[in-house]
Every structure is written in C-alpha cells, then in structure tokens.
Amino acid sequence: LSGLTCSHLNVMEKGEYRKKAAELGMAIICPDTSPRGEDIPDENGNWQFGSGAGFYLDATESPYDKNYNMYSYIVDELPSVIEKYFDFDMSRQSIFGHSMGGHGAIIMALRNPNKFKSCSAFAPIVEPSTASWSSGAFKKYIGLDQTNWQMYDSVALVKKGYHFPEILVDQGD
C-alpha cells in the first residue's frame, strides 16, 4: 500500500521487488490510496486529505462515505475480484505498505488476522488519531467522535486487544 500523497504508481514504479516477485511466481497487487475523480470539495487541494490521503479507512461522513471506503475495498472487494478472475492461492495473501500504507497494512492485519499470512510496514504511521496533520482528515472522514477513530489507529487497536502473530516494522536508519 502506498503512502500519503501517493498513488498505486509509487509502489509499481519505485519498488525493486518486481524481478524477484516474478522469479518466485508472486503477484503484487497495488491498489490506489484513495478514490480519484469524484470532484468532492477539497479533494485535491490539501496533501493531508482527499486524493492521495484516504488513510485506508471507511468514511462515515457525507460526502466522503459514498466513495472513501478504501478499508473495505482492500479487505473485501479487491480480494473477491482477484479470486474471481485469477487463479491465486488467496490463503497465502500478505499485506505491506509504506507510511500511510504501512498504517493501512497494520490496521487491516490486526483487524483480520486470519486473512493475511504476513504483514510488513515500512516507516508506518502508527497513531494517526493523535497527529495534527492526520486528525483533520479523520474528522472529515469519520466525524468528531474520536472513539470511532480507534478502529483505524493501530495503537488503539493493540490496546483493545487486537493481535496479529508477527508484524515486521522497519523505520530505516
């Protein structure tokens, strides 16, 4: 999963994994970070919100609730489409991401431990509900009640008892 201000192209173009994945017979699926072209107010005017900043959640606030459902898209809809059209062993699917994508990977793995074989996060956002630059997006997408934000915050999920066997987190040097 790509990071904040990015799109699916970041993973596809910058990752040095393609040759090795091909050798191993692995498919790498690169979904976008948010819906595109919905002409929602402020969708493209702020790097902290809208296109490129979907935070891998399911919005509950209008007008975002119609299309900003990246959590359900990645956990449910996309795997169903993949399973329907490709002969992949879905019992071996894993999830990984960078920055905001690392946040998405962790929350999806924590909330769906039987769906993913592994989870890796590179420089992930781990507590978006407390950061000033992401809490604004949470308010617009999920509303003012911060208890609703906890389902999209990995620290809050761990405190609530959500668990995934092992998560690789790399912050770099």
Regions from the PLM with identified roles:
Residues 1-173:
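Non-catalytic cap/lid and distal C-terminal segments of serine-dependent acyl enzymes
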